[in-house]
Amino acid sequence: MRHGVKTSKLQRNASHRRALLANQACSLILNGRITTTLAKAKALRPYVEKLITLAKRGDVHSRRLATATIHNTTAVKRLFDEIAPLCAERKGGYTRIVKLGQRLTDSALVAMIEIIDLPREAAEKEEAPATTEATA
């Protein structure tokens, strides 16, 4: 019986799963959004939510716990200095999962997970085409 079991094993052993979640959390913190399978996104969501809640405390002990969890000082710095102040008013639900359909190669369900309160500057820069006219 699996009563009370909240985590998904993702077909990996414990150390591989821990490394996978740490790497994906680091990528999500640095980029703001990532595209992955739906199962990995659902497993990543509580992991990142706990990190953001930890970062909202802002003390040295929380910073050390976050560094021990994701092993990337650049991501920890961005988490504490940029993301945590943006999420200060929100009590939870810092991430959003958007289902994107199936992958063509293996029909795996693909989803995009993103941090809600981040500004969309990067997305707007990608969408706006550069209008440069050649003068001849």
From Swiss-Prot:
Gene Ontology MF terms in the entry: structural constituent of ribosome
The UniProt record lists the keyword Glycoprotein: no
Gene3D superfamilies found in the cross-reference section: Ribosomal protein L17
UniProt entry tagged with the keyword Ribonucleoprotein: yes
Coiled coil spans: none
Keywords of this entry: Ribonucleoprotein, Ribosomal protein
Family, as annotated: Belongs to the bacterial ribosomal protein bL17 family.
Protein known as: Large ribosomal subunit protein bL17
Gene name of the encoded protein: rplQ
